């Protein structure tokens, strides 16, 4: 908000990237691993090959994971957002107005929307690709339904060509792609919006 109002300069993207890489390294050394681009949790296991943290979901925020996995949730309180199926809504922000609506037996919802299938698919990819679990490559626009994960890397398949390019650019993990999942590399985390657009074929 302060940047939009001109009170602070726009952050330099290269400086932000360098700080993120430093934070990732320091947190890794301290036993934390990323489970979503902006969220880290203490690991309970260490990958012997890399010496880096590996298993950590028991320490991750269940609330955050529900959001990034595109699960349903109910938000309670002034200004809270909710998401159930294709419906999304948000409550009035003013605490007095919120309390008055509840007292009068009225809905606290201020506004909402029903998401179409294209929007739901975009959000599923956009949110899922931000997690260390990544997303399944099968079912992305341009992929063929096959039991052979490696076939997704076939340059003749629309999405496969994009996936191969993302691997070549160091943005998604090649080994994970061979197992049928798009998982961001450290570089990919810095360019997650670009990766999402490429996976969606935009």
Predicted segments with their positions:
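Short glycine-/small-residue-rich flexible loop motifs, especially phosphate/cofactor-binding loops
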Residues: 24, 163-164
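Minor-groove-contacting beta-hairpin "wing" of winged helix-turn-helix DNA-binding domains
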Residues: 179-185
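C-terminal scaffold of the Radical SAM
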Residues: 1-153
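Generic leucine side-chain signal with a strong bias for well-ordered alpha-helical environments
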Residues: 27, 127, 171, 184, ...
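Short, amphipathic alpha-helical interaction segments positioned at domain boundaries
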Residues: 186-202
């Amino acid at each position: 908000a302060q940047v939009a109002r001109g009170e602070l300069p726009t952050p330099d993207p290269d400086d932000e990237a360098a700080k993120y890489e430093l934070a990732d390294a320091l947190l890794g050394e301290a036993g934390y691993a990323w489970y979503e681009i902006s969220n880290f949790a203490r690991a309970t296991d260490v990958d012997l090959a890399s010496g880096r943290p590996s298993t950590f979901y028991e320490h991750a925020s269940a609330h955050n994971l529900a959001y990034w996995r595109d699960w349903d949730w109910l938000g309670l309180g002034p200004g809270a957002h909710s998401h159930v199926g294709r419906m999304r809504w948000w409550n009035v922000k003013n605490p007095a107005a919120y309390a008055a609506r509840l007292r009068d037996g009225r809905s606290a919802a201020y506004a909402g929307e029903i998401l179409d299938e294209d929007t739901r698919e975009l959000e599923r990819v956009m949110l899922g690709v931000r997690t260390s679990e990544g997303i399944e490559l099968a079912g992305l626009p341009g992929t063929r339904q096959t039991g052979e994960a490696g076939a997704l890397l076939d340059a003749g398949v629309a999405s496969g060509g994009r996936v191969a390019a993302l691997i070549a650019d160091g943005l998604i993990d090649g080994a994970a792609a061979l197992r049928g999942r798009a998982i961001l590399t450290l570089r990919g985390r810095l360019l997650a919006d670009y990766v999402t657009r490429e996976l969606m074929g935009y």
